[in-house]
Amino acid sequence: MDSAVTAVLAGKYPAKQHARRVAEALKASGHDGSGVIYLEGTKTRMAEDSDEAVPFRQRRNFYYLSGCELADSYVTYNIDQDELVLYIPAADPDEVMWTGLPLSPEEALKKYDVDKVLASSEINAHLAHYCTNKETAPKRVYAIPDRVCAETTFLPFDDTNWDALSNALNQCRKVKDDYEIALLKRSNEISALAHLAVMKAAKLAKNERELEAVFRSTCLSHGSRGQSYGPIVAAGVNGATLHYQTNDMDLEDPVTGERPSLLVDAGGEYRLYCSDITRAYPLSGKFSVEARQIYDIVLDMQTQCMDMIKPGVAWDDIHARAHKVAISGLLRLGILRGSEEELFEKRISVAFFPHGLGHYMGMDTHDVGGNPNHADPNPMFRYLRLRGTLSPSEVVTVEPGVYFCRFIIEPYLSSPELGKYIDSAVLDKYWKVGGVRIEDNLVITQDGYLNLTTAPKDPEEVERIVQQG
């Protein structure tokens, strides 16, 4: 693990800095920069007909202003007084026997970057306390609709603004500070180790689920207690399903003994910060001719797109470059027919590369602030989760792919207008490839990018790793 990352993470999560940034964003959006910001953490919720709690997932906006993973908590930021207050559950004698003593306010004050820690039960009293002096009382509270429990009251305030806070948080969360980048780096470090472990286990594995278990256990053993999303472990034709989740197919043909290629899209989560990495490689240790041809196209797509990345560049243009590289490669193989210009104009490559090139990443895998337009009439951009130009300290994924999904491609083949651009006889050799995707996580720098992802992707190297086991 990177010692520089460890040194950064030895400090507190910069919640106070984040609160100030959000206050500045509110002011920049036309508000007077006065008032109280209010956020709630996730509530404990019981499973139906059970005394077990459902798996807990902290609200990301709450964590951004607190650094706290405790359930049933609150945070307020008095903009005028520059005071950040965390409210955590008090000890419940009936629960101590089962779960031990909770974090005390004194311990929480040492752990978190806040000015004061109170009990969750004091939230209404403290909100009212802010308004006791009418001359200095904040007039407004900023909150998020449907994120305020029935027990909380804002009656002491003259006004409640339900519109501005979510947008301000989204704008701030797009741009990562050094601490957040260190968290994302650590998440990537752990996930790279897990991807490497899966590569080494691939040759002898019998079923997709075994390799999912290898990934999860490697992450957990290195401090990543959760996954950023459900791991995708897709062998052969399963790789044509973008978010395949079954992970339960045997890895060897019972008749021929052949082992297909594997696509693994998985990322551990470290202290709520994600990674999102995809690698593809042959389970036998040697790519088939067709699989290697597609792999080389996808790697070229990623390389050319990454060469374009720097502040001020439009993500739409980088995404379009990926399609142009895909068209060139598929023409070279004979899968496509026609001119590159006509194929691009007709959006034929969407049949083989239907998703967006990438997205913002942070506390959510598909992080906030991307401004997607799923109603875009242009099919090439409809599923692009990031629209706009890149800026320093944003974190993006770059994940081109080429897929052979019958559900998507066959309507093109049957179309009188579009079918002529695809050679079905050549295409038949590639259905078994399924899909290839290569995905890295990049921080935008002042003049380019920093690649956080270190998992091997050179085709000869991944073959060697699988062969050696």
Curated annotation (Swiss-Prot):
Its EC number is 3.4.11.9. Keywords: Aminopeptidase, Hydrolase, Manganese, Metal-binding, Metalloprotease, Protease. The keyword Manganese applies. It comes from the Eukaryota. Its cofactor is Mn(2+). GO terms for biological process: proteolysis. The keyword Manganese applies. It catalyses: Release of any N-terminal amino acid, including proline, that is linked to proline, even from a dipeptide or tripeptide. InterPro entries: Aminopep_P_N, Creatin/AminoP/Spt16_N, Creatinase/aminopeptidase-like, Pept_M24, X-Pro_dipept-like. Mn(2+) 2 binds at D265, D276, E439. Transmembrane segments: none annotated. GO terms for molecular function: manganese ion binding; metalloaminopeptidase activity. Belongs to the peptidase M24B family. Catalyzes the removal of a penultimate prolyl residue from the N-termini of peptides. This is Probable Xaa-Pro aminopeptidase PEPP. It comes from Coccidioides posadasii (strain C735). The gene is PEPP.
